């Protein structure tokens, strides 16, 4: 078991806290070239130690040349992840009378109704120290697939929740529109593209159908170290 960080934006943190998000997709970087389109799996043992833990893409279904890609932080089933999220520190007066004192706390944007009212500035998730982590996850599965291979169930595990029909905006369960009025995959596609830089959308956007890491997880307690 290894303990590693993972970054989530504020909306995804809220989905995790609500119990709606149990999976995340991250870009495979670099993407395998056009000649290597057959995923083989993770290398568990090799005479080349640098290949262990990498994912292999073959030139054809029988093998041929192989291109190796290293996963982010080499996430693996059983690993424990601490979530890095948008955060800050703030002070609060506690106690009364002679016992009154100032104490310092960590605050999290995902748990604030109106983050604009915060007196202390928010810090990016990438700068959050491990000691501030409040959400811990256990990796249950890691695999590679094309982005558009995601299923409706997979989109739901990503935290997608369609409350209204996209055709008529009626509450979920209306009978006036066809089933395609509710499309979790469409919502996920929009969410995915919103996270990609405009300069990279042709390479990594939904329509480009890039290879992605699919990391499934469950909530867990902070481990003893």
Please place each PLM-identified region on the residue numbering:
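Secondary-structure transition motif
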Residues: 1-225
């Amino acid at each position: 078991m290894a303990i590693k960080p993972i970054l989530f934006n504020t909306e995804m943190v809220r989905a995790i806290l609500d119990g709606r998000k149990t999976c995340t997709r991250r870009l495979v970087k670099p993407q395998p070239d056009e000649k290597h389109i057959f995923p083989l799996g993770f290398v568990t043992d090799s005479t080349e130690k640098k290949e262990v833990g990498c994912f292999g893409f073959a030139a054809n279904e029988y093998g041929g040349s192989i291109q190796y890609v290293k996963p982010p932080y080499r996430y693996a089933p059983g690993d424990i992840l601490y979530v890095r999220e948008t955060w800050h520190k703030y002070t609060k007066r506690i106690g009364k009378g002679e016992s009154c004192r100032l104490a310092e706390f960590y605050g999290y944007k995902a748990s604030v109704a109106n983050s604009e009212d915060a007196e202390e500035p928010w810090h990016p998730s990438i700068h959050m120290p491990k000691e501030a982590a409040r959400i811990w996850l256990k990796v249950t599965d890691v695999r590679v697939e094309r982005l558009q291979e995601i299923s409706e169930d997979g989109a739901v595990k990503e935290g997608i929740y369609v409350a209204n029909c996209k055709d008529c905006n009626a509450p979920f369960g209306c009978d006036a529109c066809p089933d395609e009025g509710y499309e979790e995959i469409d919502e996920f596609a929009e969410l995915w593209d919103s996270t990609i830089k405009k300069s990279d959308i042709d390479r990594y956007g939904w329509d480009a159908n890039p290879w992605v890491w699919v990391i499934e997880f469950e909530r867990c307690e902070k481990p003893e170290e």
